[in-house]
Amino acid sequence: MQALVLLLWTGALLGHGSSQNVPSSSEGSPVPDSTGEPVEEEDPFFKVPVNKLAAAVSNFGYDLYRLRSSASPTGNVLLSPLSVATALSALSLGAEHRTESVIHRALYYDLITNPDIHSTYKELLASVTAPEKNLKSASRIVFERKLRVKSSFVAPLEKSYGTRPRILTGNPRVDLQEINNWVQAQMKGKIARSTREMPSALSILLLGVAYFKGQWVTKFDSRKTTLQDFHLDEDRTVRVPMMSDPKAILRYGLDSDLNCKIAQLPLTGSMSIIFFLPLTVTQNLTMIEESLTSEFIHDIDRELKTIQAVLTVPKLKLSFEGELTKSLQDMKLQSLFESPDFSKITGKPVKLTQVEHRAAFEWNEEGAGSSPSPGLQPVRLTFPLDYHLNQPFLFVLRDTDTGALLFIGRILDPSST
């Protein structure tokens, strides 16, 4: 993992010398093993089973995001990878060893020594979809018409993932309507009905849907929201509604390796959004994207410093509807679409045909209060600091309790949502 280098302009802090920000040579040093080679000790956070599982499926999510980003280099990108990972993890319940191993490697389960991943996944889902989180996330497995599904697959699926598979009727219009009705019910009407046609020769369809509307811990004053320039690149701008807070309390750092400014804003329900803003106006965020892992984001969360800044954030409302089939095939899951062994599901040969994802995400001025939490004490700076999200940026919505990646987005043009 790339080492995190976060600087808060050493020497610009009042009463906070650089020696307080840099660990001593002995502090945190790896302990040598029996061969004398240093062995990095696992962070205690990841020793908690649900957190370790969250890190694994989040790393799957970052992999999936990178593939989607490279496939759409000039547009906004929005994903809720957890809903897709959940569908895959649930499908693995019906896979024999060879096929199960393929899925588990993609989800990074091969790095987890957990005898009961699926019960831990149930705990993860209960945590991230608790009512106070404001996250709606659901996954479903849809099977071809008249398929006989074994009860030995349905029972653990319902127990760990809270869902039952759907068997198609064979009538494309009726089947699409039923799936749309299910999405509407799960998302409380927050995601539009799909007009996409059902695939003609469907065997297994995985569907992952998610919706999130953020509630800031400290709300923005809507009277300060104005139309401002958003710089698409060095030559082009668009006018978009920008929320402002001249005395925002946020967590901040500068990553000199990635040439970006990082800020973290808290949301209600023990969640936060981490923003990555390049030092120069560019639509190429590849260097930042390539660095993203669960461990890297966890390090950022530990290292950022609480400061006061002049903050501007565009109002945002994004949605995505589309197939992720090609992306999953590129993640070494091609065999699931060709000759998998799902004999724990049915006696008939079946294979994955399509993976569909629908997601919606928004934030505006709404928040829990008009002032920061009294316990937040910002570091005092000798000069004012600005953090203006008025150019292409990347954001990560993270569950603070488990570290799970819930949404990830790249915003190249907030007016094109």
From Swiss-Prot:
Pyrrolidone carboxylic acid PTM sites in chain numbering: 20
Signal peptide boundaries: 1-19
Cited CDD domains: serpinF1_PEDF
GO MF terms, alphabetically ordered: serine-type endopeptidase inhibitor activity
Residues bearing glycans: 284
GO CC field: axon hillock; basement membrane; extracellular region; extracellular space; melanosome; perinuclear region of cytoplasm
Pfam family, one: Serpin
InterPro entries according to UniProt: PEDF_serpin_dom (IPR033832), Serpin_CS (IPR023795), Serpin_dom (IPR023796), Serpin_fam (IPR000215), Serpin_sf (IPR036186), Serpin_sf_1 (IPR042178), Serpin_sf_2 (IPR042185)
PROSITE patterns hit by this protein: SERPIN
Single GO BP term: response to peptide
Tissue specificity of this protein: Highly expressed in the liver, gastric glandular mucosa and renal tubules. It is also expressed in the brain, heart, lung retina and testes.
Intracellular or extracellular location(s): Secreted; Melanosome
Function of the protein: Neurotrophic protein; induces extensive neuronal differentiation in retinoblastoma cells. Potent inhibitor of angiogenesis. As it does not undergo the S (stressed) to R (relaxed) conformational transition characteristic of active serpins, it exhibits no serine protease inhibitory activity.
Name of the protein described by the UniProt record: Pigment epithelium-derived factor
Organism: Mus musculus
